[in-house]
């Protein structure tokens, strides 16, 4: 699973997800991409499961880029613990995603295979997604 090697602070605020993605909202590397349509948190396990699906389809003749990284810790307290006595320990890591953010990029595949792979990956994501194709392709 993806997680930062070290962070400046151990625990984060939850924050707000308002607005659209103004960076990372267009295909840069590949020919096909998976784009988020709604805001949400994507866990590192979900990113990894999507990457595995795409790697299976890409094999040796294509290339895959994962365009998001889980850099926000989500804390949880122990079950049945009393209120107070501080914030819980970091349980897992999430990537904050805004509408328009490109999640994965692919190249070196036919359009039908790429669409099939990205559709399966989109179903594994906790946010609605759409498949986008690079204009120069």
From Swiss-Prot:
CDD domains in the record: Ribosomal_L16_L10e
Major location (coarse): plastid
Cross-referenced InterPro entries: Ribosomal_uL16, Ribosomal_uL16_bact-type, Ribosomal_uL16_CS, Ribosomal_uL16_dom, Ribosomal_uL16_sf
Name of one Pfam family that matches: Ribosomal_L16
UniProt KW keywords: Chloroplast, Plastid, Ribonucleoprotein, Ribosomal protein
Region described as Disordered: spans on this chain: 1-21
GO biological process, one term: mitochondrial translation
MF annotations from Gene Ontology: rRNA binding; structural constituent of ribosome
A GO cellular component entry from the record: mitochondrial large ribosomal subunit
Disulfide cysteine pairs (residue numbers): none
Protein location: Plastid, Chloroplast
Stored NCBIfam families: rplP_bact
Family of the protein in this entry: Belongs to the universal ribosomal protein uL16 family.
Oligomer and partners: Part of the 50S ribosomal subunit.
Protein name (database record): Large ribosomal subunit protein uL16c
Organism: Tupiella akineta (Green alga)
Gene: rpl16
């Amino acid at each position: 699973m993806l997680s930062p090697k070290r962070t400046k602070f151990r625990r984060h605020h939850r924050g707000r997800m308002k607005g659209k993605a103004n960076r990372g909202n267009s295909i840069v590397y590949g020919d096909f991409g998976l784009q988020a349509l709604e805001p949400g948190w994507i866990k590192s396990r979900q990113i990894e499961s999507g990457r595995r699906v795409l790697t299976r389809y890409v094999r040796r003749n294509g290339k895959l880029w994962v365009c998001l990284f889980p850099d926000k810790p989500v804390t949880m307290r122990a079950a049945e613990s009393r209120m107070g006595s501080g914030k819980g320990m970091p349980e897992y890591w999430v990537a904050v995603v805004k509408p328009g953010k490109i999640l994965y990029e692919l190249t070196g595949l036919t359009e039908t295979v790429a669409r099939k792979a990205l559709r399966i990956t989109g179903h594994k994501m906790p946010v609605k997604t759409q498949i986008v194709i690079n204009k120069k392709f």
